[in-house]
Amino acid sequence: NGNNELDRALAEGIHLCNIERNGDVVEMTSYAPLLCKNGYSNWNPDMIYFDNSEKIRLTESYKMQKMFGQHAGDTYVVSELNLPAALKRYVGTSVVKDSKTGKTWLKVVNALPRTLKLQVNGLGSKAVEVKARSSQVFEL
């Protein structure tokens, strides 16, 4: 229904997979608004909520953005996701390589209500599972 915090984060994750795929034309993304004091929201969703104590609540969107930030690369690796067309809009994938560390990351965002079992070919064949309505990063 799109009103759920997790639904929004999964949609953002699928969008970020597409952003990475088009990294040759997209130089930067941003998230706004970032901070919100509890009870004073002018816009929904915000990413980080706080109050007058030291209590901070990090949203699912924060966790999704963090996943992409911590597993960034400077080279996009062309990949193909073999799913029925009706399901592709609910799954995002992105493969990037970081030339400084030599690490290659596969990010999978699964907005489907079931676990995905994927066979990854190319940099060594391996099977991976991504739980329903979640995201995961794999080092290839």
Regions found by a protein language model. Give the residues of each.
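Aromatic/acidic polysaccharide-binding cleft in carbohydrate-active enzymes
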Residues: 1-93
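Active-site proximal loops enriched in glycine and acidic residues that flank catalytic Cys/His/Asp
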Residues: 30-33, 52, 80-81, 108-112, ...
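Short, glycine-/Ser/Thr-/acidic-enriched flexible segments
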Residues: 33-36, 55, 100-101, 110-114, ...
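Short acidic, gly/pro-rich beta-turn/loop elements at beta-sheet edges
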Residues: 39, 75, 116-118, 128, ...
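Hydrophobic beta-strand residues in large extracellular and virion-surface proteins
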Residues: 48, 53, 106, 118-120, ...
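Carbohydrate-binding surface patches
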Residues: 88-122
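Intrinsically disordered, low-complexity Pro/Gly/Ser/Thr-rich segments with frequent PxxP/GP/PP motifs
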Residues: 123-140
